[in-house]
Amino acid sequence: MRIVEIVPVTKTKYRVVTDEQLAFMLYKGELSRYRLKENGELSAEIFQEIFREILVKRAKLRAMHLLTRMDYTEAELEKKLMKGEYTPQAVKIAMDYVRSYHYLDDERYVARYLSAYQGRKSRRQMQFELERKGIPREMIQRRQEALDDEEGCVDETDMIRQLLEIGRAHV
C-alpha cells in the first residue's frame, strides 16, 4: 500500500491517504514512530498494527466518550464516528464493542424517548423524529404499543385540549 498524501488537519493531527482510497487520522508523533512519509510504502503489517493499536482503540474510546455525554442511536453514533474520519472497519468494531456492553441499545433509546415525550408530542411527531435519528419504523411502533399497554393509551385529543387551554392562559 502506498501513501499518496499526508495532509495536516491541525498542528498535530494529519490525514493519511493511501492509494487504495483509505484515509485515516494520525498524530505527528505516530507518523514519526511508524516513519510514514508521502509517497512512501505502508506495509500490511504496519497498517495492521496502526489499525489495531491506534485506530480501533481510538474509535472505541471516542464512542464511549460520546455516550457518556448523552444517548445516541446506532445510526447517530456511527455517523458521528465516520465524521471523525475513523476507518469503516474501526467504526464497525467500536460499534460492536459498545453494543456488547449495552452502552448502545436502540430499543432502550426508543423506550426512554417515548416515555419522556409521551403527553407532550403526538405519536406521529415522535415517530418522525425517531425515524430521522435512524430508528426503524417497526421498532418504534412495537415500543409505542408496549408503552400503551403498560401505561394506558394517551388520548391525543385530550392532549390537544390541554395545550390549547395552556395557550389561552398565556394570552
What would you call each of these model-derived segments?
Residues M1-R168:
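An alpha-helical, amphipathic repeat domain used for nucleic-acid recognition
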Residues V171:
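Calmodulin-binding IQ motif helices
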